[in-house]
């Protein structure tokens, strides 16, 4: 096949889609490029019927290669290893908008691999990978109701930005990724700095409009080189069997969905499913139990959806706008730095905040460069939270994604580093789940941080919205249950403060939603969020003024850059000695900012005292309590400050010239001395007197900054012929 190229003007960039040259044995392969960032996306799908599957086995693997940026991977093996969290998140970003566009009951295996081959650090590869996946699917011949487009939207000074550069993104108040078909939005993922509902809705509409040129070009590419799609038809529905299941089970299923307790309801539905399968197999043993079970599930879906659309109470008895009952306990765990038990209906999370120092920050080494993450949020979803057994171990894709969403919701309200220099780690343990556990994590995180004494700019709450839509009838649901998520058409999570939205995630399972529905969902989400914030404020209105007694303390000092060497010492000896003597962790950066970290307040104060002594200047006219460090023929060296000595001449020690210094002073002896002067070489002249004499008053209070000589350096100066004479006194 000849190489085919499509060029699209996309914001300030030129997007190039190429096929026919690379990976020609894949069903679909597209090289997507934008200003030096190149991503190869391939699609392969199995042509067998997939009848052995009862789910759609779609796999998306996004991978970044270090050679793309001219780097060699770290580690012993010097090659790329398991996917990073960022790669996992982008894999999910590609998966979410394309999955709903495959036909119902299409169970053939499909694999998409997106590989970053070249990276311009100013151009993020995620949008390029999403567009490349859409193009590769569109030419692969797989049944796919696309294509989709994707775009990133920023917001600065009242203007929306299309696919902003990395520098522009740093100045933007919004980072929104949107994907959809030419007719409808399918997926939104965003982080914002407390923006209004209208601004967020406008960003979604703007991004959707801008991506239509990309969709048009992919359609043209598919017409030119796309493989013919097989005539795929969903298996025919056995209408007789469907009617029989309805007759046998409908009344009992309707009654089961009046049971408000999740576990009791599930137990009853399991019993009814097994009874229905047994009854129908007894009537006709040629029937397939899996087919009966699937039709039973369709009956459940129909009952729940129609009841909601008819205006009847939801599964747990609520109306469409009511949030489930909330209970909150802060200081839930005794020895943690901050903790919260957040319960909303049958969804519950124990959220724990831990404070650390700069050394606890996570170092992330990716192709975009090395970064330090000072705010970590880890979300755990153990199987017991839904009453099941299962494997426990490394976080799955869903856990990584939920943790990332909750983290983005809090980023806008975290204090500045100079105000609160701690590194923060949050762990959310989901102990019960019946929908919206990620939003429970958002609420619990806000409370746990305030419980730990973190001065958040504002509390943050989150709520998950749902949608039931049949034709022109629809209902938007606030604070959805797990069943309403599973049986519904939308999962729309919104988090924010009283002032505005900080994070938003939307996944649509149908062909799309109207602007009216989106506006209704945002309006109800604001109402629900405001209610939840009120409950949270009743439990803990402000952050604790004192840190937990179990939390470490951090003190920050700023010293002149020319003092850094003094504090570190030769080969790091001085700073190591400070750490060993005080037990305090000490970090100093190139700008002279020192961070002291210890659970012991007294140790922190001692370390501060020693550092101040290290960098202190000797002042002429001041009196110091010094220690005799060395005795020589012409006097004694007195240590005034760490690393700073002065000479007490023999004339200031002995009344008689024949008297020896050793007869008056001994090494280690402490005496009070007066700084009489500092010469151009930085040598300090001392007097052994109770108070300054009259002639010293001329310099009283004067401060002289100089390069002070140590005892050894002064001794060398004197021995080399620069001896301080009595006449100089």
Swiss-Prot record:
Subcellular location: Cytoplasm
GO CC terms: cytosol
Pfam families referenced in this protein's UniProt entry, alphabetically: KH_1 (PF00013), PNPase (PF03726), RNase_PH (PF01138), RNase_PH_C (PF03725), S1 (PF00575)
Gene Ontology molecular functions: 3'-5'-RNA exonuclease activity; magnesium ion binding; polyribonucleotide nucleotidyltransferase activity; RNA binding
Chief site of localization: cytoplasm
Key words of the record: Cytoplasm, Magnesium, Metal-binding, Nucleotidyltransferase, RNA-binding, Transferase
GO biological process annotation, one example: RNA processing
Keyword Lipoprotein on entry: no
EC number: 2.7.7.8
Reactions it catalyzes: RNA(n+1) + phosphate = RNA(n) + a ribonucleoside 5'-diphosphate
UniProt domain S1 motif: residue ranges: 621-689
Residues bound to Mg(2+): 485, 491
Classification via InterPro entries: ExoRNase_PH_dom1, ExoRNase_PH_dom2, ExoRNase_PH_dom2_sf, KH_dom, KH_dom_type_1, KH_dom_type_1_sf, NA-bd_OB-fold, PNPase
Cofactor list: Mg(2+)
Main EC class the enzyme belongs to: transferase
Keyword RNA-binding: yes
Domain (KH) ranges: 552-611
Residue ranges, annotated region (Disordered): 710-729
Subunit relationships: Component of the RNA degradosome, which is a multiprotein complex involved in RNA processing and mRNA degradation.
Free-text function comment from the UniProt entry: Involved in mRNA degradation. Catalyzes the phosphorolysis of single-stranded polyribonucleotides processively in the 3'- to 5'-direction.
Similarity comment text for this entry: Belongs to the polyribonucleotide nucleotidyltransferase family.
Protein's name according to its UniProt entry: Polyribonucleotide nucleotidyltransferase
Organism in which the protein naturally occurs: Legionella pneumophila (strain Paris)
Gene name tied to this protein: pnp
